[in-house]
């Protein structure tokens, strides 16, 4: 009897201990799962917060680069404008005594190359972008860029209903052109057609695992026999037409064919100098009348708002606006800029006049496009 009672108590004790162990394990497992979920949630939250923080820093850097205002001022403007960068720039400039641009060109997080080609009465300038310098310098990338540059030169890329000589500043024209390029048959270096440009581009993307794409594109066709076409590539990477930045320039010279017989070297040298100035000074238009009128109106509104607290008569305010607009034009208009290749402090327009007079030429700048990899102009 005692022995059986002892066994019964022992069995109950063992069963109770087993249940306690099982419950403990289950509780521990549940706690562990909960802890893991909390860690994951914290990690995701931290990553999202870090991403948001990085994006905000990029916006602040962009605004500061354009306005040269303090980080605090830029941050306050960004918050007030609900993270709208363009509106924040306007707000900073309106609230600043000196509302002029510090720079119209800002950095972008992209690598790539520029290529230009010229043939008889046509010239093209094209930009190919990717994520890393390593890929941009790869022979496959360079070859692809050169091949599509030739394709653009020989084929009708821009539809007949659009002015082929529209500047790249016309964003719709550039988009239409790039879409047409992507659909065009791709001819390799051996003259063989291998699918379309789009298919070849996807092939390169799969090889390099990077976001390779056509950035900007511009093409110009001569309007008359007096137009002289020229390109200049800076920081050359391959041959003489592929590099990190490039300018496509069109100048009109009276009796061009006759003048080229005796002045060709001088004309080419002068065109090169103008291109180097354009790369350095980064103008957005040839002359004042060719500046986008929306940009002009926006600029005048910003200047007027920045002067609203001065309590001056309207005629004085108008004179001040005109003075600031003159300074604005001297920063962004080619012919109004101070020539950067010497220390004479002459305007580009005066440099052209002096060269024309010294060489018995009549020169007018008709058109230019300026592409710099990793930079974009906020007025374009």
Swiss-Prot record:
Protein localization: Mitochondrion
One CC-aspect GO term: mitochondrion
UniProt entry keywords in alphabetical sequence: Elongation factor, Mitochondrion, Protein biosynthesis
GO molecular function: translation elongation factor activity
Misc. remarks from the entry: This protein may be expected to contain an N-terminal transit peptide but none has been predicted.
Record family assignment: Belongs to the EF-Ts family.
Function: Associates with the EF-Tu.GDP complex and induces the exchange of GDP to GTP. It remains bound to the aminoacyl-tRNA.EF-Tu.GTP complex up to the GTP hydrolysis stage on the ribosome.
Name the record gives this protein: Elongation factor Ts, mitochondrial
């Amino acid at each position: 009897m005692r022995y059986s009672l002892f066994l019964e108590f022992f069995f109950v004790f063992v069963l109770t201990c087993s249940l306690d162990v099982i419950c403990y394990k289950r509780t521990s497992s549940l706690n562990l799962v909960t802890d893991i979920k909390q860690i994951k949630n914290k990690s995701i939250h931290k990553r999202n917060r870090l991403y948001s923080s990085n994006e905000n820093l990029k916006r602040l850097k962009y605004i500061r680069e354009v306005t040269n205002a303090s980080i605090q001022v830029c941050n306050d403007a960004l918050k007030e404008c609900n993270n709208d960068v363009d509106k924040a720039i306007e707000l900073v400039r309106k609230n600043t005594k000196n509302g002029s641009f510090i720079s119209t060109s800002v950095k972008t997080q992209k690598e790539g190359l520029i290529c230009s080609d010229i043939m008889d009465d046509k010239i093209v300038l094209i930009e190919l972008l990717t994520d890393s310098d390593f890929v941009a310098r790869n022979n496959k990338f360079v070859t692809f860029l050169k091949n599509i540059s030739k394709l653009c030169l020989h084929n009708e890329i821009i539809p007949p209903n659009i002015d082929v000589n529209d500047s790249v500043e016309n964003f719709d024209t550039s988009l239409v052109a790039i879409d047409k390029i992507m659909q065009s048959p791709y001819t390799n270096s051996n003259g063989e057609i291998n699918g379309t440009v789009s298919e070849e581009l996807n092939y390169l993307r799969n090889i390099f695992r990077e976001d390779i794409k056509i950035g900007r594109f511009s093409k110009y066709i001569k309007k008359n026999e007096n137009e002289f076409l020229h390109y200049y590539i800076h920081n050359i990477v391959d041959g003489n037409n592929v590099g990190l930045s490039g300018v496509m320039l069109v100048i009109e010279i009276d009796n061009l064919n006759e003048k080229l017989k005796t002045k060709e070297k001088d004309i080419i040298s002068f065109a090169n100098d103008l291109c180097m100035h354009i790369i350095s000074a980064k103008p957005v238009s040839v002359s004042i009348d060719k500046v986008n009128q929306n940009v002009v109106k926006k600029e005048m509104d910003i200047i007027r708002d920045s002067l609203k607290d001065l309590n001056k008569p309207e005629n004085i305010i108008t004179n001040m606006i005109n003075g600031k607009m003159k300074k604005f034009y001297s920063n962004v208009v080619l012919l109004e800029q101070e020539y950067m290749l010497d220390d004479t402090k002459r305007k580009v327009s005066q440099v052209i006049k002096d060269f024309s007079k010294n060489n018995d030429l009549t020169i007018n700048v008709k058109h230019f496009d300026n592409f710099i990899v990793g930079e974009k102009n906020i007025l374009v």
